[in-house]
């Protein structure tokens, strides 16, 4: 797609309330393999941009500010929240997380797909504002497998693992709110399913209309209920 075509599509799609880029929300309980799958998907599909969240939690080993998260203080986070800078925000395990509204809208308007690694609370907030956002819930093959993965990654103390397992049940209960569910039993199969979801989303009527609006208008095809 040329830049001129993308720009033309954007003009029509913004008027119709649809962006050229898609918004994916990946949700999972801690230890389900969400980050590993997302990183693999991003490495294979350069058309997807990862949204980097703001957080007040401490960096883990190997994490870099501006690459994995925008690490900030509670005071700064609250100031940004008061200024309505976040598309969504939530408190998870005692830490605050928030997603930049401006950055996401800029990416989607320019035709880039955006992926959010997000919790179910944040996904609910995003869905209220972007009805075409696609929710993908990653499930473990069993609770026993989830516990084993949390122990093997060696990032949390035993009491934290216990807390995460207790929270997993309530988090998994929200899987029904997602458009798609991927069971991460084997990495390769789960990744292939994620790729299929992305491909199918890009072929939805609204996505195709937003990216090829001039062609659709020429052919007399319009968005349902478009003004």
From Swiss-Prot:
First-tier enzyme category under EC: transferase
Location in or out of the cell: Cytoplasm
Keyword flag Transferase: yes
InterPro entries attached to this UniProt entry: GK/Ca_channel_bsu, Guanylate_kin-like_dom, Guanylate_kinase, Guanylate_kinase_CS, P-loop_NTPase
CDD domains in UniProt: GMPK (cd00071)
Molecular function GO labels: ATP binding; guanylate kinase activity
Highest taxon in the source lineage: Bacteria
Primary role: Essential for recycling GMP and indirectly, cGMP.
PANTHER family linked to this entry: GUANYLATE KINASE, GUANYLATE KINASE-RELATED
Catalytic activity annotation: GMP + ATP = GDP + ADP
EC annotation from Swiss-Prot or TrEMBL: 2.7.4.8
Residues bound to ATP: 28-35
Domain Guanylate kinase-like positions: 21-199
Family as reported in the entry's similarity comment: Belongs to the guanylate kinase family.
Protein name: Guanylate kinase
HAMAP family linked to this entry: Guanylate_kinase (MF_00328)
Species annotation: Burkholderia thailandensis (strain ATCC 700388 / DSM 13276 / CCUG 48851 / CIP 106301 / E264)
Chief site of localization: cytoplasm
Pfam family, one: Guanylate_kin
Keyword Cytoplasm: yes
Keywords per UniProt: ATP-binding, Cytoplasm, Kinase, Nucleotide-binding, Transferase
A cellular component annotation (GO) from this entry: cytosol
């Amino acid at each position: 797609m040329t830049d001129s075509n993308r720009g033309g599509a954007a003009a029509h799609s913004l008027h119709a309330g649809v962006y050229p880029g898609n918004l994916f929300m990946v949700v999972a309980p801690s230890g389900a393999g969400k980050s590993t799958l997302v990183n693999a998907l991003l490495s294979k599909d350069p058309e997807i941009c990862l949204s980097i969240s703001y957080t007040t939690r401490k960096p883990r080993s190997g994490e870099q500010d501006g690459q994995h998260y925008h690490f900030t203080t509670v005071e700064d986070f609250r100031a940004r929240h008061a200024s309505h800078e976040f598309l969504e925000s939530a408190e998870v395990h005692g830490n605050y997380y928030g997603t930049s509204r401006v950055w996401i809208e800029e990416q989607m308007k320019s035709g880039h797909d955006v992926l959010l690694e997000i919790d179910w609370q944040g996904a609910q907030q995003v869905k209220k504002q972007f009805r075409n956002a696609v929710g993908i819930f990653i499930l473990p093959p069993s609770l026993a497998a989830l516990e084993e993965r949390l122990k093997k990654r060696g990032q949390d103390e035993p009491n934290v693992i216990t807390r995460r397992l207790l929270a997993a049940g309530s988090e998994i209960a929200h899987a029904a709110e997602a458009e798609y569910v991927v069971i991460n039993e084997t990495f390769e199969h789960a990744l292939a399913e994620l790729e299929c979801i992305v491909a199918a989303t890009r072929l939805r009527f609204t996505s195709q209309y937003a990216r090829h609006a001039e062609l659709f208008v020429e052919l007399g095809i319009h968005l349902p209920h478009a003004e």
